[in-house]
């Protein structure tokens, strides 16, 4: 096992090989741990290293950073794979004024504390890079939002860590006990923190009372009801977030979810991060998150109060400057939104506060003029002249709108019916009544009997999107002949701009929504893009709250669900419909002006048919050209031919190189064959000479057979190779000669090699 060292200056010099250098001149130092030993504590070893800028203490067992404050010039600190236990040790780096890079990966503090990165960014203001990742401005803002009111004492940091551990443990365990146990636990924990002298960043003391009352109210419910207990640290963070969001209401970016979707704000900091859920059904009931939220300024969630807090999705570039209260369920807004009139974002103002909405929801029948305080009524009144009949009818339309959209009393309904009865006998003068789709829809709603099929379709139309609802209202008005005769607009200069303005306000300028079958893949694409956006910009808990690079694209994606982009085929058909409608509109204008003859109408219709036919022919030609271009690309392209030539050139070059190598090998083989020829010739000559010598010895042996044996061994003669040749009387000489002849015959190469 590796040794553990308590670092001092002598050990530091030995490990860093600083035998002769002065400590004041050292600027970079690497003290990585190894199998031989690891540093356990640093102590006062760096007291004299005033100029040290880069320090590497990775792969050690350091548990305390006490003594790091002496490195006043330190810019880079690597504590990778150590044993830093808590945020208290991280706060010891605060006296380093020039620290820019810090690496604390694989330390226990990173694993245990969920808010470690935000705390490090908030504590070390000069930090530019943390854990090999750049520190973003959004992280600095989120850290400031979370820790702006926290103290710097070690006791408080320890308490924060304790609450973080409690939160981690209680997220894994579901408390099934009675809800009445919550209030004493929260109260006791708060009293304990107050006795320790800790600063609790609650905006006021009433939050504790509200928490107690909420817990008591929930305790009187059914015994089988389950309640999640949240630790004190989470409540403190929530209170801090609520107070700072109220103070910086105009500076911080607000979240405006579209209808039919619910964006749950991160009231509770869990390890899962933030959740974004899209709900197509109604409200899913209360959750423990909303049960523990303090409600000092709760708005009454009535049918009328929600009308002033709708979201305008007519223009994705403009958002209403009003903030939704976090207590009101956003599904309620999504359901009520379909019953309201979609106005342009630049014309809807914050004319009333929450008090006015509450008074309006409680007393709708005290004053009949109270309904004109709605933004629709203000808009219609401002666009009309109060002295003319047009202004009177517009005011009447606002009353009708309020009547059809509010739960009014019978007296107000009777008054409206009386005004409508007088309106049936009224013959409109030229230019006195604009053809407003909203007016026609409101009047059609009251004029039709309750049993008619068109009146039965109104609840189903309310569930549609605003753009589809607006178009169906317009088509219904144009399709109803009685209303068209009763409210047809005559020639006039004021009627056309006013009706066009109202049409643009209600999104009636051609913004049809595509069919549901075309919208389904669009929703899946938007969800996938939103998840990719979250993965790209998420840097820990609370990092997406103030990240404008994330909030802008996310808002556009969510708004595209309400007003999706139409398909190409659908857009082409709508363009044709728009051209036909424009021609019909021009035709009606010319008819009213008396400048158009019926023959001209027929000729214009024929021209329109010709134009449409030419459009079809041109589209077919475009498709044919695209097909020919595709086939030409598949058949061959000059760039492809060039590539093939290059490839062939490379192949030929490789073949030339191979042939050159083969030629070199052949030359070497020829040289080897020539050498073999010379060797063979010399061997043949030697063999012939030896055969001659053997024949001579055999002849001499036959003449000397009578000599004694000891004298029958004459001295050998010298051979032409400088070797003595033994007499033929020895049998070994004969055997040796035979072996030599045999070996030469075996060494003789094949005839094919000499050819």
Curated annotation (Swiss-Prot):
Renumbered residue ranges of the record's region Disordered: 354-374, 448-517, 701-755
Signal sequence, renumbered to the chain: none
Composition bias type Polar residues, residue spans: 721-731
Disulfide bonds: none
One Pfam family hit: LRR_9
All copies of domain LRRCT, residue ranges: 107-146
UniProt entry keywords in alphabetical sequence: Coiled coil, Leucine-rich repeat, Repeat
Highest taxon above the source species: Eukaryota
InterPro entries reported for this sequence: CEP72-like, Leu-rich_rpt, LRR_dom_sf
Positions with biased composition (Basic and acidic residues): 356-370
Residues forming coiled coils: 601-671
LRR repeats: 51-72, 73-94
Matches recorded under PROSITE patterns: LRR (PS51450)
Biased composition (Low complexity): 498-510
PANTHER family in the cross-refs: HEAT SHOCK REGULATED 2, LEUCINE-RICH REPEAT-CONTAINING PROTEIN 36
This protein's name: Leucine-rich repeat-containing protein 36
Record organism: Mus musculus
Gene: Lrrc36
């Amino acid at each position: 096992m590796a040794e553990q060292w308590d670092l001092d200056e002598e050990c530091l010099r030995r490990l860093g090989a600083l035998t002769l250098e002065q400590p004041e001149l050292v600027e970079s130092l690497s003290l990585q741990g190894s199998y031989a030993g690891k540093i356990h504590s640093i102590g006062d070893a760096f007291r004299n290293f005033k100029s040290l800028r880069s320090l590497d203490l990775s792969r050690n067992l350091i548990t305390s950073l006490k003594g790091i404050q002496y490195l006043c010039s330190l810019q880079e600190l690597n504590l990778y794979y150590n044993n830093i236990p808590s945020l208290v040790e991280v706060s010891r780096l605060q006296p380093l004024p020039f620290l820019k890079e810090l690496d604390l990966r694989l330390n226990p503090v990173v694993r245990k504390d969920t808010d470690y990165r935000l705390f490090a960014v908030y504590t070390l203001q000069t930090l530019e890079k943390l854990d090999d990742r750049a520190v973003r401005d959004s992280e600095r803002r989120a850290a400031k939002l979370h820790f702006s009111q926290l103290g710097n004492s070690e006791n408080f940091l320890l308490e924060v860590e304790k609450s973080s551990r409690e939160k981690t443990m209680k997220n894994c365990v579901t408390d099934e006990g009675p809800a009445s146990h919550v209030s004493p636990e929260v109260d006791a924990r708060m009293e304990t923190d107050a006795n320790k002298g800790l600063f609790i960043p609650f905006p006021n003391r009433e939050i504790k009372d509200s928490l107690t009352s909420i817990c008591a109210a929930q305790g009187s419910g059914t015994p089988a009801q389950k309640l999640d207990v949240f630790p004190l640290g989470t409540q403190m963070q929530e209170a801090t977030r609520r107070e700072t969001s109220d103070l910086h209401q105009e500076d911080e970016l607000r979240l405006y979810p579209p209808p039919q979707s619910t964006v749950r704000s991160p009231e509770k900091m869990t390890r899962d991060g933030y959740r974004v859920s899209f709900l197509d059904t109604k409200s899913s009931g209360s959750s423990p998150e909303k049960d523990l939220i303090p409600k000092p300024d709760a708005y009454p969630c009535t049918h009328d109060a929600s009308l002033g807090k709708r979201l305008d999705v007519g223009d994705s570039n403009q958002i209403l400057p009003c903030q939704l209260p976090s207590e009101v369920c956003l599904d309620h807004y999504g359901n009520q939104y379909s019953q309201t009139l979609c106005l342009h974002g630049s014309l809807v103002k914050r004319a009333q506060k929450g008090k006015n909405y509450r008074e309006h929801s409680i007393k709708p029948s005290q004053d009949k003029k109270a309904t004109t305080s709605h933004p629709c009524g203000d808009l219609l009144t401002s666009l009309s002249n109060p002295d003319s009949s047009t202004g009177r009818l517009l005011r009447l339309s606002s009353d009708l709108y309020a009547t059809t959209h509010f739960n009014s009393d019978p007296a107000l309904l009777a008054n409206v019916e009386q005004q409508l009865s007088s309106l049936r006998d009224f013959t409109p003068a030229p230019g006195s009544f604009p053809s407003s789709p909203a007016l026609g829809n409101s009047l059609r709603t009251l004029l039709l009997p309750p049993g008619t099929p068109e009146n039965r379709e109104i609840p189903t139309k309310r569930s549609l999107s605003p753009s589809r609802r607006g178009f169906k209202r317009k088509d219904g008005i144009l399709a109803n002949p009685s209303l068209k005769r009763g409210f047809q607009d005559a020639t006039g200069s004021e009627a056309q701009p006013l009706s066009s303005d109202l049409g643009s306000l209600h999104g009636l300028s051609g913004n049809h929504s595509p069919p549901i079958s075309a919208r389904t893949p669009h929703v899946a694409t938007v969800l996938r893009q939103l998840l990719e956006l979250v993965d790209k910009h998420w840097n820990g808990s609370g990092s997406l709250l103030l990240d404008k690079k994330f909030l802008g694209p996310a808002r556009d994606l969510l708004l595209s669900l309400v007003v999706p982009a139409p398909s190409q085929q659908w857009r082409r058909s709508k363009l044709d419909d728009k051209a036909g409608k424009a021609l019909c509109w021009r035709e009606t204008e010319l008819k009213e002006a008396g400048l158009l003859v019926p023959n001209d109408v027929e000729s214009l219709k024929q021209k329109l048919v010709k134009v449409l036919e030419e459009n079809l022919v041109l589209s077919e030609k475009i498709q044919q050209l695209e097909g020919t271009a595709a086939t030409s690309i598949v058949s061959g392209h000059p760039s492809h031919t060039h590539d093939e030539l290059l490839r062939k050139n490379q192949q030929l070059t490789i073949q030339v190189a191979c042939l050159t190598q083969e030629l070199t090998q052949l030359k070497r083989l020829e040289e080897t064959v020539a050498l073999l020829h010379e060797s063979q010739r010399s061997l043949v000559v030697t063999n012939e000479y030896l055969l001659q010598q053997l024949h001579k010895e055999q002849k001499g042996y036959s003449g000397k057979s009578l000599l004694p044996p000891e004298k029958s061994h004459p001295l050998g003669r010298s051979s032409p190779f400088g070797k003595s040749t033994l007499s033929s009387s020895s049998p070994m000489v004969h055997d040796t000669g035979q072996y030599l002849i045999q070996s030469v015959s075996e060494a003789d190469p094949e005839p094919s090699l000499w050819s």
